[in-house]
Amino acid sequence: MSMWILMYHSCHTLHAIHVANRLHDHPSSDAADSTGKSRAHHIPTATRSASFDRMDCLLALALTMASLFTRLHQIGRRAIVSWDEKFFGSFGNQYINHTFYHDVHPPLAKMLVALSGALSGQNGSFAYPLGDPYPEHINYTFQRSFVAMFGVLIVPFAYQTCRYLGFTRPFACMAASFVLFDNALCVMSRFILLDAPLLCFTAMSLLAYAAFTAYRDQPFSLEWWRWLGFTGLSLGLVVSSKWIGLFAIALVGLLTTEELLVLYSAVSVRPRAQLKHWGARVICLIAIPAVIYTGVFQLHFMLLPIRGTGDYKMPSQFQALQRNSVVAQQPHDVAYGSQVTLRSNLPGFGLIHVNETFRFPDGDQECIEAGIGGKQKLNWWRLVSTSLTRENDTSPIKHVLDGDFVRFFHEGTGRWLRTGAHKPYHVGWGRRMFAGGNDTSPSLLDLWRVHVASEDSPMPRGQLYTVTTSFRLVNAFTGCALQATTEQLPQWGRRLSELICAESNMTQTESSLWNIEQVRDKRFKRANFRRLVKRRLLRNTIWINREMALTNSRLVADSDHYKHTESDPWSWPFLLYPMRLVSWADDSVKYYEVGNPLLWWASTLCCLAYPLQIAYWLARQRRQYSDWRPGELERFWDTGKLLWGGWALHYLPFFLMQRVTYIHHYLPALYFALLLLAFEIQCLASWYLPRIHAWTIAAIAVTGAGLVFCLFSPLTFGWDRPIEELAHLQWLPSWNLHTCKYDI
């Protein structure tokens, strides 16, 4: 990111002059080196293409047909549930069965997987167990082909994008062919995965923005509005498929900010026009993606109205509206003597849980109290008053009111909800929470005062109700408040979330808010929660996204165990650790996620060299060398910053992530890198090989890429013979194609 900012500041002045010249319609002329010996650089096309003729359509069609072959050839050869088909196939089933689930990714791409299953006639009964053969009634070939069509589209999208960026036809064809002949892009489009839709929508976003820039000189025209709106639509689709789409939003956001700042500095643009430019981009690039993203989650909730495996991740109010949910089938009232479960209003914590076997390792032998996601029998507490007699569900009804002092007795262990003098294990403030004492030894340390914060039902505030009442619990002796955290305890605490008692000045947060999720009390009748609880789309969308983020952050690599599928970001551009996708048994149809080495290494070289090129030419320009015709360096920067910036923004953030990473996370960045490679070849060919026909240069590059693709194609289309026969394809010793010192 720092490199991006440095390059932006270095070229901002040049770009502003270029835009101002265009606004004032200044003429341009060729320039030569001050010594008279240097030939001025130029980009082969003078203007960006804003329309497609018949030849462009024919070339795009030919590329599409070739893409269809590479993505669909023998796609049903492996009739076994392979790799992450286990997850995404089963997630698709949830939509067919309408049962709620939880995952780390937004739902759009999984909805498309579900659509493929529905169109193929599935009834949602197949569980997609890893390694099991597909039964006859599952048309897995259709499902894979449906998903593969998104991978097919990125090839013609690449051609169209390059034409809008000013590539000549030969080099636009070359760029699309690079995308066509990359083995990793191809193989990841051939299974029931999310990568193909993600790549398709990423390519669509780049295409839309490139087309929009081609109409930059025609502001507020029909085509200008169409492509600006289509950019927002594409950004909404890509971020609704995977959060990697946020990098595409960041790219368009940075470039849009730069453009608006340049327009702001242009004296020829009136203030009213400035406001129109800002308003158009707010509507199309912020509002449209936000509406699409929220709408996708609204559809997600509508399609999954039945209780499922993931409902425990959602707040109690959401669960109360799910069909077949235990939260919806209980009383609304609660009183002393009721058995209750306590849920935090902090996403990621869950319910307060106690287990007799979970103990602190520092000599304190009290039971750990922590947050757990699922509903378990050790989550239940008896709500009792300060009287010496412990109430139960046969006692006279006495409701819990705001300001009451209460105790919580855990009948599973015979202990009380209690705080003490010890510091929490992870959190650096507050007091430790534990289950202490016994059924005959209550203490002031387990006496809590109820502070009702809000009531989300039509019932009057001031009394405790199930699901709808949010409240705080303040310890009567210490004055600290019961507070949830998302800090996980070590393995001795089963990775559960730590529970603490925070000082009073730390309690005005959602983490100190609680509600009763379930109640057991035969004194009360079952309530109709559909009349008591409101549907809150925005709240549920924010909640589920926070849960997704927390789950995603907890997907960390285990440093004590080697996993052949994992790899670090620094290794991706150099293709050091390709990935086995399936079993490597001799009779298994084997697939290897290895990219086209020629394309990966060449594109990496271009991505590393591009900032150095810009720095070199800027330094020469400061020394009064005229290596470029007027406006040409800015055009080189305009196109290069879009492609290089896309690569950098889709790649470099992975170095900051703590979660486990895989080589397929690099594929969106690779798409930008391949187009940048083609752009560099076009520029270098025009500068240093002007006498060689462009089609000849493009044909040589495409032939080389195609030959390497064919060489590795057995690993892309499936290899069902002993892998030793392909030992010659292990180009690097780090590859685990043929030899690997670890068992898989």
Predicted regions and their residues:
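Transmembrane-helix motifs of polytopic, lipid-linked glycan transferases
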Residues: T141, S145-G166, M204
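Transmembrane helical bundles and short interhelical boundary loops of multi-pass, membrane-embedded
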Residues: W4, H9-A40, A214, W227, ...
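Membrane-interface alpha helices of multi-pass inner-membrane proteins
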Residues: A176, L222, R226-S241
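Lectin-like carbohydrate-binding module/patch detector with strong preference for beta-trefoil
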Residues: F301-T541
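Extracytoplasmic catalytic/substrate-binding loops of multi-pass membrane glycan-assembly enzymes
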Residues: R77-S90, F100-L115, Q122-F126, I138-T141
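Short acidic/glycine- and proline-prone juxtamembrane loop motifs at membrane-interface regions
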Residues: S82-W83, A184-L198, S241-I244
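Short helix- or helix-capping micro-motifs
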Residues: S67, A175-L180, V187, L235, ...
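Membrane-interface transmembrane helices that cradle and orient dolichyl/undecaprenyl
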Residues: Y164-G166, S205-R226, T257-V262, I681
